[in-house]
């Protein structure tokens, strides 16, 4: 299955973005993870069908209520994100960060 990795830039922390992303991904039968980054962005990696990933990307550009998405960056090499879980998880720390 195709895999995609994104960084979402804007007001995306403290507004329920990770929970919303998880619900959206599960509804689309995607697996992967989402986490807050120390720089204030949200990072995620998902795999599934091309159609489901395209729907997720469209949703990410809008975001949930109370968020403001300024930009979505699609990363070229999501394979370096490592193995994905069997479902879609919220991760609480970026590798090497001391806080959420």
Curated annotation (Swiss-Prot):
Reaction(s) the record says it catalyses: an acyl phosphate + H2O = a carboxylate + phosphate + H(+)
Listed Pfam families: Acylphosphatase
InterPro entries: Acylphosphatase, Acylphosphatase-like_dom, Acylphosphatase-like_dom_sf, Acylphosphatase_CS
Entry GO MF terms: acylphosphatase activity
Domain Acylphosphatase-like: 3-92
Lineage, uppermost ranks: Bacteria, Pseudomonadati, Thermodesulfobacteriota, Desulfovibrionia, Desulfovibrionales
Stretches the record annotates as Disordered: 76-100
Family of this protein: Belongs to the acylphosphatase family.
Protein name: Acylphosphatase
Membrane-crossing residue ranges in chain numbering: none
Active site (catalytic residues): 18, 36
Record EC number: 3.6.1.7
UniProt keyword annotation of Hydrolase present: yes
Keywords annotated in UniProt: Hydrolase
Biological source species: Nitratidesulfovibrio vulgaris (strain ATCC 29579 / DSM 644 / CCUG 34227 / NCIMB 8303 / VKM B-1760 / Hildenborough) (Desulfovibrio vulgaris)
Keyword Thylakoid: no
């Amino acid at each position: 299955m195709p895999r995609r990795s994104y960084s979402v830039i804007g007001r995306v922390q403290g507004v329920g973005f990770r929970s919303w992303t998880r619900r959206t991904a599960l509804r689309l039968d995607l697996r992967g993870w989402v986490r807050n980054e120390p720089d204030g962005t949200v990072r995620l990696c998902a795999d599934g069908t091309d159609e489901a990933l395209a729907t997720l990307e469209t949703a990410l550009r809008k975001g949930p209520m109370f968020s403001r998405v300024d930009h979505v960056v699609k990363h070229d090499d999501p394979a370096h994100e490592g193995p994905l879980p069997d479902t879609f998880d919220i991760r609480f720390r970026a590798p090497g960060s001391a806080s959420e």
